[in-house]
Amino acid sequence: ILTATAIAISSCQGDLLDTKPYDKASSGSMWSNENFCTMGVASIYATLREGYVAKEAYLMEAFSVGATCRDNDYPLLAGTASIGSGIFSDYWKQHYAGIYRANDAIVHLPDAPISESVKGKLLSEAKVLRAFYYYKLNAVFRGVPYYNTPMELDQADKPRESEENIWNFCIQDLTDAIN
């Protein structure tokens, strides 16, 4: 048994443990071809389907006659929501997740090995979505921290920009997307 174990261990190949994930794109390969670039920009859209980003139309409908709402939406609808209710922190986190994804695309797409027409389209989409997420945050919080690159942990305490500056950043992103 000892001899068989020694032979089995010595015959193992060292590169078996150095594998790449096949079920998801790593940060190094994410922007390496047109398909991955398209998926990266699609992930910015995916944030639109999450939590309070997606529920705003439903929440507005809840004000109508005969509408019903779920228990966890009641504080917002009744005007009694507090900072501790989680509604505002969820709203913040979900929008900044979209901004992070948009920034990742905006930073990496210019160097991606894809056609200029596809690159321009994807960059425009990323800039429009980043402007949209900042628009939504600025409308609620009247000034937020502004990031134009993927945020690192040591940047999490960045000071808040003025409301006017955020509007100007949104206008610039939309102007860039048009051009």
Task: Kindly give the residue locations of the regions a language model identified.
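Sec-dependent N-terminal signal peptides
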Residues: I1-T5
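Membrane-proximal, proline-rich intrinsically disordered regions
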Residues: C12-L59
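Proline-centered turn/helix-capping motifs that create local helix->coil transitions or kinks
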Residues: D15-L16, Y52-V53, A67-C69, L137-Y146
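Short linear capping/connector segments at secondary-structure termini
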Residues: Y22-S26, G79-I83, N148-Q155
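Conserved, well-structured interaction surfaces
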Residues: N33-A42, A46-R49, N72-F141, Q155-I166, ...
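Short, surface-exposed recognition loops and adjoining beta-strand edges that mediate ligand/DNA contacts
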Residues: A54-A67, N72, Y147, N179
